[in-house]
């Protein structure tokens, strides 16, 4: 009976029918803590604290509790996490490199490890003896990642800032005392240039062991093995995760290497960002890629789809030093963060709030989950410490002594609905708070330098100062009829050109008293039966935009008849026009300086002699008035008004002037001709005379406007 009862009793962790019973392990995540004995300071060569960059638990069965830590000065230390004696806690310490060690990897099943350093080399070490086995040379920049295959102990891969991925085999003989790469992928994460595609040309044979190119802008940040013949890599700027087949030769042709599969950047950022860490779950199916856009993407490494299966949010990733790790059973994901904490997500529920390991005072960079013990986690931080987190053994509440010894604790992060929505959409503009009476000036960003120099200090400005003063605003117009409604604006199609010129911002469209305009208004003049107002464009006149402001030189020129004529706005040397006021002055020899077009219709045909004050204008218009009767002048004015001038108009004018009988009868034609030649531009071409267009075929300018309705 006793034997049967023992056999029928369910085993620990199994149900009644022998099926494994799954415990809710996520409830245990909040029980992680770190005490002072598990906090280790990373010291440099001179005894000063330096930040640790990499940590990894051993893969040897009898040494799975040994933690290897590499720091910024190239020192590697081995800690026994099971030992409670502080004197025996540090197992081994040696100077691996003279530069920073960025990554570290254990040889599967052996007491050896490989370090990747900023001195452009990777070294193989015997950790028990502390001796150097071999040195790998071939990279031309810092090495950022090193990884071993689970199926091969002698083969490992490295990735560097030179953009190259190199394969190493420690079974090969050393040349010159160093290991050389057996295979390499040059420019693994170079940006694709669509305008200048690479040409298919054979590579020239190069010296074995030297990388053919250096491109620090296309750095390879992480390389891991998927299986014996496949590696996965990620870069710093291209935002693509690539899978490579090592059985293919990528250096035979001068072209960018093509991976067998790639995962494009799945985020919403306009600029493709890079990845700082890649990690596979124990089955090798799920690939976790930690991106610098504060997301961890989970891809199906064995499937055909390239879209992420899940996205883990909540942490911050602002550097390429932040790494990730997976629990031994593959149920949880661990990652460092820039907000001084480590995060743990449940893989099966990515939308659930993560558990944070708090206590560090700087960025948490490298993390490691012990593959032989679920209850043990290691974290490295920029606060120059390495911490080992363990599950609390007791189920009772912590005593006062335990709280004093605790330097790290775990808690569940609370997600706010606004923060979750902000991760899924583009942030909008902040709304203005109506309750606040002050508007603060912008504060410096968190990444701004401390030495601000002469920059102004943040201040608060009353909102009332930003509001417009009602005294400075235009008051509402009140109708004369007594109604408090402003008159209806006239449509632009029914308004004449006079309304556009004389209206001011404070005047209405129609009023009983005309509001004087600050600009000179156009005065209506009598028009010819078939000719509108005309203007002659002189030979040396330059085309420019019409301005209604008065120039400083002609500010004193006032028309005696108050005709409101439009005067010249620029000096005569720049813009000389046919000013009717100057012509009228020479005709009457009086103070009346205004000439209206109605006088021209009466047959005004006299020759004007220029006065000293108007010599500049009269020299330009003298030859034009000598053309003959008024009908010829009308024809010229009409052509200049209603048609654009031809390129040979200057030569045609001179030819017509020479052939005029009145000009032949004049006493001194040579002086006038010389004056005209001085006014002509040098580059005027000589071409035949153009025939003017008959005025009958032209449309009157007055037909383009509507009469103002009264």
Swiss-Prot record:
Residue span of region Disordered: 428-534, 652-698
GO molecular function, one term: protein-macromolecule adaptor activity
GO BP, sorted A to Z: DNA damage response; DNA replication; mitotic G2 DNA damage checkpoint signaling; proteasome-mediated ubiquitin-dependent protein catabolic process; protein monoubiquitination; protein polyubiquitination; regulation of cell cycle; response to UV
Residue ranges with Low complexity bias: 430-450
Subunit structure: Component of the DCX(DTL) E3 ubiquitin ligase complex, at least composed of cul4 (cul4a or cul4b), ddb1, dtl/cdt2 and rbx1.
Physiological role: Substrate-specific adapter of a DCX (DDB1-CUL4-X-box) E3 ubiquitin-protein ligase complex required for cell cycle control, DNA damage response and translesion DNA synthesis. The DCX(DTL) complex, also named CRL4(CDT2) complex, mediates the polyubiquitination and subsequent degradation of CDT1, CDKN1A/p21(CIP1), KMT5A and SDE2. CDT1 degradation in response to DNA damage is necessary to ensure proper cell cycle regulation of DNA replication. CDKN1A/p21(CIP1) degradation during S phase or following UV irradiation is essential to control replication licensing.
Protein name: Denticleless protein homolog A
Gene name of the record: dtl-a
